Each structure stands twice: as C-alpha cells, then as structure tokens.
Amino acid sequence: ATCDLLSGIGVQHSACALHCVFRGNRGGYCTGKGICVCRN
C-alpha cells in the first residue's frame, strides 16, 4: 500500500522501508508492481 500511495512523490521506497521497520524488519523495498516487500 505504501508504494502505490506515495509513488507520485518519489518516496515510496522510504515509506515502505519505514513500514517494515515498524513491523520489526530490517527494512523493505518496492517491487516493480508496487508491492512493498519487507526484508527479514
């Protein structure tokens, strides 16, 4: 969700990473399809 919502501003990867960090992951990234993928 974070990737699609902020894609127009160019901060989708940061929002996705923060979302993952809050969930206890080390970070995350957006796929080409706009899906946020968290790292373990």
From Swiss-Prot:
CDD domains the record matches: DEFL_defensin-like
GO biological process, any: defense response to Gram-positive bacterium
Cellular component aspect of the GO annotation: extracellular space
Induction remarks: By injury to the larval cell wall.
Pfam families the UniProt entry points to: Defensin_2 (PF01097)
Record has Transmembrane as a keyword: no
PROSITE patterns in the cross-refs: INVERT_DEFENSINS
Expression by tissue: Hemocytes and fat body.
Protein name: Sapecin-C
Disulfide bond sites: 3-30, 16-36, 20-38
InterPro entries per UniProt: Defensin_invertebrate/fungal, Scorpion_toxin-like_sf
Higher taxonomy: Eukaryota, Metazoa, Ecdysozoa, Arthropoda, Hexapoda
Function: Sapecins, which are potent bactericidal proteins, are produced in response to injury. Sapecin C is cytotoxic to Gram-positive bacteria.
Protein family (similarity comment): Belongs to the invertebrate defensin family. Type 1 subfamily.
Keywords: Antibiotic, Antimicrobial, Defensin, Disulfide bond, Immunity, Innate immunity, Secreted
Record localization: Secreted
